[in-house]
Amino acid sequence: MKNNLNKVWNLNIPIWMKSRVNLFIFFWMDLALFLFIKNKLFSMGLTFRLISFNFLLSIIWCLISYINGRYSNFRNIKNIFKKIYKLLTATLISLTLIYILDKVLIIIFPELIPFGKNKIILLGVSSFLIQSLKIYPFRKISAKNKIYLIGNDFEKNEFIEFIMQFSLYKSLEILDFSKEISKSTEKKTILILGEESNKKNIKFVYDNFLSLNLDILSPFNWCEKNLQRIPLNYLSEKEYQSYDWIIDSESFEWRLKRFGDITISFILLILSSPIIIVSSILIKIEDKGPIFYKQIRTGLSGKEFKITKLRTMKTKSEKNGPVWAAKNDMRITKIGGILRKTRIDELPQLLSVLVGDMSLIGPRPERPEIEITLKKHIRYYDLRKVIRPGLSGWAQVNYPYGASLKDSENKLSYELFYIRNYSFWLDLLIFIKTIKLISNMKGSTPIR
């Protein structure tokens, strides 16, 4: 039905957005509920200015709720009572924060209408009940998604071994391709592994099953659609050549991105200057070493540039050459550990965004010395250089900070997805997810 609606309305919904339909639905329901309670119930004599303030407050409410995990499905929690507890806790925290913010705004702008206890209780109860709909098991567990594999035994086993590492695997039923495929209307996916050897099977599928409710995909397309990443082992030369990896920097979309980089980085530099000053004082007090640390990084089209960070390691930590940070790295100072977790050490890089060496969102720039090794072992590594590097990116919000060749390869798979699927809305999602990571103190912590 969803596919039919897309055809009727000519909808071209991005891949990353399709997997977050529930999040968007509950986000907009929460937004509408907040505005209804704030503007309609118990309110009189609303002016345009008051409505505008209420709308801004509703956006902040939804952002706080997202950061606290109120729109999560809590899939990793099996016990429904634990899910309810998590949702209730997140709701109470969000209510407390928005209530405090409302009180602060009333002090600054006395003409505003305060939230009041009745409204805040009504918002909390009604919002909790609506959000609980997504975790209550109203229906039986849906049937597993069937995937029929076409390919030789090695290709099939390789694919199965690859997807077993993802939680998505539990919702799949992997089947061998057969000419006895059920012609039922249930959703099915036919995954074509390998290349030329499967031409007969491919022709048979298109001739006999194209009218059914199924997807016919390559592993490349399936991973992009379901994992929102492009694993390098499924990026064949054919797939590589079928897509134009050159970005038109003169297009309106990329000009808008650059305008946003300049505007937001300038504002953030001003707002974060007190934090940078306080952090600088703490760094100096701890070991009396230099405050800033400068590095050479590789940027757009392989051009090298210099970035500035707040120093988080002991002086002379790299006297034997650059190495990746490790978990519980003894080189990191006490203040440095906090700065890394909150990503405060990255704030001076806003200057690099302002001058055009970096973007707010994009692949993280790497050091030339480390890139020598990465390019030797990772195929298509230089593809990440077709766009400006960023302070945060799709890899950073989806994959823990890595410290190995394998981690770099996994991060590249997310970066290639970002390059192929770039949009203003995807940048906005990454920006919000970055705020969530920072608020949860999940900054630069290596996974090994």
At which residue positions do the language-model features occur?
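C-terminal terminal-structure detector
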Residues: 2, 6-10, 380-448
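Short, glycine-rich, amphipathic interfacial segments at transmembrane boundaries or analogous
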Residues: 223-224, 230-233, 293-331, 392-413
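A hydrophobic, helix-centered structural microdomain
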Residues: 253-316, 352, 424, 429-448
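N-terminal hydrophobic signal-anchor/signal peptide
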Residues: 1-30, 133-270, 448
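A short, structured surface patch at a secondary-structure boundary
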Residues: 326-388, 430-434, 438
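Hydrophobic alpha-helical elements at and bordering transmembrane segments
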Residues: 84, 88, 256-263, 412
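Signature of alpha-helical transmembrane segments in polytopic membrane proteins
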Residues: 1-140
